[in-house]
């Protein structure tokens, strides 16, 4: 039997406008939303008393994501149940059609506690300790890397086995490079606060075009699923970009655990429907459900930084690249002189 918890949040409308006339009506609604939160394995419960048919709607990201029709009940309040498991996580608004001034705002959290994973080091490869790594991705057996900082930002192609540069270009001094990803034989490289993305030919490194970000605040990490791109901006949002529409930001998912939102998602990597993400100033990798935004697991890398040469410019973990043939992850950090090939222990 499901426990029904009355909410302190309710609608009580005694008058409303319809066809420019004021009609006396009463709509009473109570929900099981507690502390403005529900989890995605909960069932939204509405206790409704209305003398007319109603349509409840749920909005997310300014888009309509659910329609909940309710039949009138003349004398008694009735309960209605709606499952939430197919919705994305994050901030939602529940309202009655034609009564958008009356809203229940709530946050949908994940029902799962993130699982903690350890790792095993398979190999270590030397590299320059001057690489301020912002993005990392394999194309076949070749590693591509985006290096940051004003006046030092680069796009490089690397033989990871010996650290030799196979190609490189220096960005203008007023651009701070961030994440990169490869799709349709093009390299997409983000900038930080400049709010533009750069598009290069994969083979020649010739710049083809650029694009504006839209509503995202900054450029942090980026990855792709072969069709769409997924871009972080330092907030809890990961934006979904359409390469067929000049990388237009079509939508976003919000990243949450079972308790709260997660911000500062940095370098991203797409593997088998999951987004693997560094989090700025945290020594680990979040495993994100790309459909709903739930953090399903965390790879604990807390002692990895100790295994590189310690120096005054040594910075945070940042850089995830998945090698599809080797079925392993390559991880590194800003100003690290090593890149580690690791296996996730599940």
Please report, for each region that a protein language model flagged, where it lies by residue.
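Bacterial signal peptide processing site
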Residues: 18-21
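Blade-loop segments of beta-propeller domains
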Residues: 163-200, 206-216
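Short loop/turn segments that connect beta-strands within beta-propeller blades
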Residues: 158-163, 201-205, 243-246, 289-293, ...
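Beta-rich, blade/repeat-based domains predominating
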Residues: 129-140, 173-184, 214-226, 259-271, ...
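Beta-strand-rich domains and repeat architectures in extracellular enzymes and scaffolds
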Residues: 122-154, 169-181, 333-335
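Surface-exposed, short loops/turns at beta-strand junctions within beta-sandwich domains
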Residues: 83-91
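Conserved beta-strand positions in repeat-built beta-propeller and related beta-rich domains
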Residues: 145-150, 189-195, 231-235, 277-281, ...
């Amino acid at each position: 039997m499901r426990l029904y918890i009355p909410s302190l949040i309710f609608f009580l409308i005694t008058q409303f406008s319809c066809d420019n006339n004021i009609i006396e009506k009463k709509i009473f609604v109570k929900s099981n939303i507690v502390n403005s939160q529900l989890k995605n394995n909960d069932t939204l419960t509405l206790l409704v008393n209305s003398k007319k048919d109603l349509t409840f709607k749920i909005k997310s990201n300014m888009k309509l994501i659910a329609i909940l029709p309710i039949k009138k009940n003349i004398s008694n309040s009735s309960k209605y149940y709606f499952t939430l498991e197919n919705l994305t996580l994050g901030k939602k608004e529940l309202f009655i059609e034609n009564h958008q001034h009356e809203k229940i705002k709530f946050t949908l959290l994940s029902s799962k506690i993130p699982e903690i994973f350890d790792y095993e080091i398979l190999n270590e490869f030397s590299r320059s300790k001057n690489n301020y790594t912002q993005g990392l991705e394999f194309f076949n057996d070749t590693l591509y890397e985006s290096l940051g900082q004003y006046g030092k930002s680069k796009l490089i192609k690397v033989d990871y086995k010996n650290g030799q540069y196979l190609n490189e270009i220096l960005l203008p001094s007023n651009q701070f490079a961030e994440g990169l990803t490869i799709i349709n034989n093009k390299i997409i490289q983000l900038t930080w606060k400049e709010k533009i993305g750069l598009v290069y030919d994969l083979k020649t490194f010739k710049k083809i075009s650029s694009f504006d970000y839209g509503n995202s605040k900054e450029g942090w990490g980026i990855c792709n699923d072969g069709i769409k791109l997924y871009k972080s901006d330092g907030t809890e949002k990961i934006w979904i970009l359409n390469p067929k529409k000049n990388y237009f930001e079509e939508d976003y998912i919000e990243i949450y655990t079972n308790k709260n939102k997660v911000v500062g998602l940095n370098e991203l990597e797409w593997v088998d429907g999951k987004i693997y993400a560094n989090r700025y100033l945290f020594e680990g990798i979040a495993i994100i459900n790309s459909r709903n935004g739930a953090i399903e697991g965390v790879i604990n890398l807390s002692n990895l930084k100790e295994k590189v040469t310690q120096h005054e410019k040594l910075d945070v973990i940042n850089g995830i690249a998945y090698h599809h043939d080797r079925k392993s992850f390559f991880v590194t950090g800003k100003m690290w002189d090593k890149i580690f090939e690791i296996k996730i222990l599940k």
